[in-house]
């Protein structure tokens, strides 16, 4: 009888494992669908913004505040299906619009090709760090505290440079930010495949912010060095 009970327990455990794995695969697929949708809407937002460049530049603070409001709306609607997806796409669309002044600066200094170059580099970084997260034997969860401290340092340095206005200091900040968010890509990717997020929305916004910040950092570096070449 005891042997029979143990056999049943093993079968139940195997069934639970298969069910959990199936749910995790579905979770990951949904996450990357939302991530892809976020990138698409951010691109649409940026294109519409570039088509109305003067208006976006004139009201850039309005769009920035709207983006912040949408982000906090997303954070507060995490547990509300439907609304959280709407807020995710509202936030990502607005983040594309608020990129327009930076995109315009880079295009003016280095041409449209520089934007595609930055996007290509960001995509390569994202792909490489994602593969690393999936292949490595290391538990990247241990990086969490270090990455958060580094993020605070980068934010503080960015605020300081708002007053200093140093191009070279900005290059250092952008370089550090690119490295930091590249590491965050690996960190967040591993957390996603381990099922550490509560919902695909949470996971998708983490990946989106990682991608966006690497892209912004590369754009800033290209813009600054293009200006120095002239």
Swiss-Prot record:
It is found in: Cell membrane. The keyword Nucleus does not apply. This is Uncharacterized protein jhp_0854. The keyword Transmembrane applies. One of its GO terms (cellular component) is plasma membrane. It is a multi-pass membrane protein. The chain crosses the membrane at residues 34-54, 56-76, 87-107, 111-131, 146-166, 167-187, 205-225. InterPro entries: Bax_inhibitor_1-related. Keywords: Cell membrane, Membrane, Transmembrane, Transmembrane helix. Belongs to the BI1 family. Pfam families: Bax1-I (PF01027).
